[in-house]
Amino acid sequence: MLYLGFKAFGLNRFNVYSVVRTLNPRITKVTLTGLSLATDISIDNPTNTSLKVSKPVVTITTGGKYAASSVPSTETFTIAPQTRSALGTIEVEVPWTSLTPYISNLVSRIPSLIGKTGQSPAALDLPMEYYYTVYVNDLFYQSSPEKIA
């Protein structure tokens, strides 16, 4: 019981002090089936203890409804105390069917996206949000939704 309390305290410290950053969100591909969004992930650990963190699963929503998520991974990282660690790039394939309510707004933008990688998802002008889920020291954590900029 004491062990679980210690682990929960560690998760609370992660929640309060650590910062997960999504860096360089971008459109990487536009196809007939949908579009691919990618972002680089890093974690700041300002605490004095190391953390074991799973690779985050990023979920995209539009208008509060599920659109797509990244593929879960068993990959884990040890985040050293008082450091920023890069966790790599996460890619999410968003099918056009998830964007159907917004297709009239997208039709005019799609030609400008084809063949141009690296554009910000903000170019889509859609109400897209993301949140991530991650295990920290074997305890589950889900972030609050944030608008994709």
Question: Where is each model-derived feature located?
Answer:
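Intrinsically disordered, low-complexity Pro/Gly/Ser/Thr-rich segments with frequent PxxP/GP/PP motifs
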Residues: T59-S108
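Short, solvent-exposed loop/turn segments enriched in Ser/Thr/Gly
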Residues: T33-D40
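Terminal connector regions
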Residues: V94-A149
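Asparagine-centered strand-capping/turn motif at beta-strand->loop junctions
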Residues: I43-S50
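Single-pass alpha-helical membrane anchors
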Residues: M1-F9
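N-terminal low-complexity, acidic/Ser/Thr/Gly/Pro-rich segments
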Residues: V20-K29, I90-P95, A149
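Proline/serine/threonine-rich low-complexity linkers at boundaries of modular beta-sandwich domains
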Residues: A8-V20
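Short coil-to-beta strand junction motifs in C2/discoidin
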Residues: L51-V57
